[in-house]
A protein has these predicted regions:
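Rossmann-fold NAD(P)-binding glycine/threonine-rich loop
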Residues: 76-98, 109, 114-117
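Short, ordered loop/turn segments at secondary-structure junctions
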Residues: 35, 77-79, 103-105, 130-133
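Hydrophobic beta-strand scaffold residues
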Residues: 30, 72-73, 97-100
Length: 248
């Protein structure tokens, strides 16, 4: 039986990549592509909703899917732990699945997990992320997820040291981690998680140079997983065994 997919935001750059991958997946078919002017009722009849819309629209997409008893895969940025908490009770009450993937790149997920693994051993951490000038939101969903994972890993050690955070130039605080966002031409996506301690520092860098090639393997994993998921799952690192299990 073919799984019918409603793709929201399918005309954007990520949406087009997802569409191309689904077209190559056995047992899946994109039945409808929704844009910014579409009525969300067009997801009716789908077996799975894939959201590649905008941070502002994404929460309505998730709610519309859950209210209809349809599982949803979210690739849109802007989903912090606080925002996910707003829809978690709805998902659990409906008995559906909502899978949030801040970044479909396996390398990016591994970089975030490595940063979390290193976090207990360094008292200071900051994140620098750079994206192309067309990316609307900042900090990126990947940076937010990385910061949240790093702080969660330091439960026994307490928060990171982050001096002078009252100054705007010190970046935006995400879970107590300063995050610095760059938006400029000539770059697709790059993140540096910089951990520091007395006499040393560790920098974990991930650089995307081809979005379609980098995201395709993660999309191929996430789409079938989301179809069968129950409850809320956050992060590609929870779909594969990379030896480091993160929190949803």
């Amino acid at each position: 039986m073919t799984t019918q997919v409603a793709l929201v935001g399918g005309t954007g750059s990520l949406g087009r990549i997802i569409h191309g991958v689904i077209d190559q997946l056995d047992g899946f078919e994109v039945r409808s592509v929704l844009g910014s002017a579409s009525d969300l009722a067009e997801i009716d009849g789908a077996d799975l909703v894939v959201d590649a819309s905008t941070p502002a629209a994404s929460i309505d997409v998730v709610r519309a899917a859950v209210e209809r008893g349809i599982n949803v895969l979210v690739g849109t940025s802007g989903w912090s732990q606080e925002r996910i908490a707003l829809v978690r009770p709805l998902v659990e009450s409906a008995g559906t699945g909502a899978v949030f993937i801040p970044n479909f790149s396996l390398g990016s997920a591994l970089g975030s997990a490595l940063a979390a693994a290193a976090a207990p051993f360094f008292p200071s951490a900051e994140i620098v992320e750079a994206h192309h000038e067309r990316k609307i939101d900042s900090p990126s969903g990947t940076a937010v997820r990385t910061a949240e994972l790093m702080v969660a890993a330091r439960e026994a050690q307490g928060p990171f040291q982050a001096p002078h955070v009252d100054q705007r130039a010190r970046g935006q605080q995400v879970a107590g981690v300063p995050v610095h966002s760059l938006r400029r031409p000539g770059v697709i996506a790059k993140q540096e998680a910089i951990l520091s301690g007395p006499g040393e520092s560790l920098t974990i860098v991930h650089d995307t140079v081809d979005s379609a090639a980098a995201y395709a393997p993660g999309i191929r994993l996430a789409v079938p997983f989301a179809r069968d998921a129950r409850g809320v799952v956050v992060g590609l690192e929870n779909l594969v065994d990379i030896g480091i299990r993160a929190r949803s």
